[in-house]
From Swiss-Prot:
Record organism: Frankia casuarinae (strain DSM 45818 / CECT 9043 / HFP020203 / CcI3)
Stated family: Belongs to the TatB family.
Quaternary structure, from the entry: The Tat system comprises two distinct complexes: a TatABC complex, containing multiple copies of TatA, TatB and TatC subunits, and a separate TatA complex, containing only TatA subunits. Substrates initially bind to the TatABC complex, which probably triggers association of the separate TatA complex to form the active translocon.
Protein name: Sec-independent protein translocase protein TatB
Keyword Membrane: yes
Highest classification ranks of the organism: Bacteria, Bacillati, Actinomycetota, Actinomycetes, Frankiales
Function noted in UniProt: Part of the twin-arginine translocation (Tat) system that transports large folded proteins containing a characteristic twin-arginine motif in their signal peptide across membranes. Together with TatC, TatB is part of a receptor directly interacting with Tat signal peptides. TatB may form an oligomeric binding site that transiently accommodates folded Tat precursor proteins before their translocation.
GO biological process: protein transport by the Tat complex
Length: 179
């Protein structure tokens, strides 16, 4: 009867009623309050029955509490009660890719999975051969042949500069309509 009202609150309300109405008028006020509540319930039940009879038999199982926006959304999001027609709820392979039903496992980035030599990352990648020259052009001086391995690997990791041509530079034309 008292949804959300505990016994402590009921006792406080009775004490307030006792002080406001006094011990002589409190029983009559309680009877009047009970009568008003009973009439309100009958009025609400009558309106609910009239609504169900007006809507017809297809809405006989309609629950008025389901019409509250929060319960409506909660019911249709968390239960398998479709609001949309079945052809609109059918999932396609594109939906499964976008929503990620079976997401691919992300590669783990640990020290053991990373390549040790930064120059030898991916030989299939275009331009990987140009990053590490096989042999320096021209004659090799005896001083360079005895370079320490750490300096040699540092020299190998420096990418080769692209050759510059002295010809006229071709600029990309600017199209003001395209932007």
């Amino acid at each position: 009867m008292f949804n959300g009202v505990g016994w402590g609150e009921v006792v406080v309300l009775l004490l307030i009623g006792l002080f406001v109405f006094g011990p002589d008028r409190l029983p009559k006020a309680a009877r009047d309050a009970g009568r008003v509540l009973r009439q309100l319930r009958q009025l609400a039940n009558g309106m609910r029955n009239d609504l169900r009879s007006e809507l017809g038999p297809e809405f006989a199982d309609l629950d008025i509490r389901d019409l509250h926006p929060k319960t409506f959304v909660r019911k249709h999001l968390f239960e398998d009660d479709p609001v949309l027609p079945p052809y609109l709820t059918k999932r396609t392979s594109l939906d499964s890719l976008l929503l990620g039903d079976d997401p691919p496992a992300a590669p783990s980035l640990t020290k053991s999975s990373l390549p040790r030599d930064p120059a030898a990352k991916d030989p299939a990648r275009p331009g990987a051969e140009a990053a590490v020259p096989a042999a320096p052009p021209g004659p090799v001086s005896p001083m360079l042949s005895k370079v320490s391995p750490s300096k040699a690997s540092a020299a190998r990791s420096v990418p080769a500069q692209p050759a510059r041509s002295d010809g006229p530079a071709t600029e990309v034309p600017f199209d003001s309509d395209a932007t």
